[in-house]
Amino acid sequence: MYYPLLSIALGSVLGAWLRWFLGLKLNPIYPQIPLGTVTVNLVGGFIIGFAMAYFAHSDLSPNYKLFVITGFCGALTTFSTFSIEIVTLLQSGKWGMAMLAISIHLIGSLIFTCLGLATYYWVAGH
């Protein structure tokens, strides 16, 4: 009963720490589109794509899936931070930059999720 909760909790802690660290290091580089937020969403998309394909072909305990997907990726990626960054750009009249950021996050995340799936199938020889 407690293993699923512990799996999610541990994954969440690690994902949140990585998200915080990347935000600290990358967001100051290009504040108009904070690179930390972009990075965590793209990397999270890749990881979840790879993980979904992997776990679909794995006999591992479901707790590992909870650790990686629900815990780690759930805490690593961020829709709320993305949303406030877009609203802030819109409020400051930076419509073009807001549309660019939306495109990078949405299209990029979908591409990286597909790349994660493709990487698993390539590595696994499927």
Curated annotation (Swiss-Prot):
Mind listing the UniProt keywords for this protein, alphabetically? Cell inner membrane, Cell membrane, Ion channel, Ion transport, Membrane, Metal-binding, Sodium, Transmembrane, Transmembrane helix, Transport
Where is it mostly found? membrane
GO CC, sorted alphabetically, is: plasma membrane
Specify which residues bind Na(+) according to the UniProt entry for this protein: G74, T77
**Which parts of the chain are coiled coil?**
none
The UniProt entry lists membrane topology as:
Multi-pass membrane protein
GO molecular function, a single term: metal ion binding
Q: How is its activity regulated?
A: Na(+) is not transported, but it plays an essential structural role and its presence is essential for fluoride channel function.
GO terms for biological process?
cellular detoxification of fluoride
**Highest rank taxon of the organism:** Bacteria
Q: Which reaction does it catalyse?
A: fluoride(in) = fluoride(out)
Report the InterPro entries cross-referenced here.
FluC
Pfam families, alphabetized = CRCB (PF02537)
Residue stretches spanning the membrane: 4-24, 33-53, 67-87, 97-117
Cell compartments where the protein resides? Cell inner membrane
Family the entry assigns = Belongs to the fluoride channel Fluc/FEX (TC 1.A.43) family.
What HAMAP family would the database entry show?
A: FluC
The protein's job, in short, is:
Fluoride-specific ion channel. Important for reducing fluoride concentration in the cell, thus reducing its toxicity.
Q: What is this protein called?
A: Fluoride-specific ion channel FluC
Organism, scientific name: Acinetobacter baumannii (strain SDF)
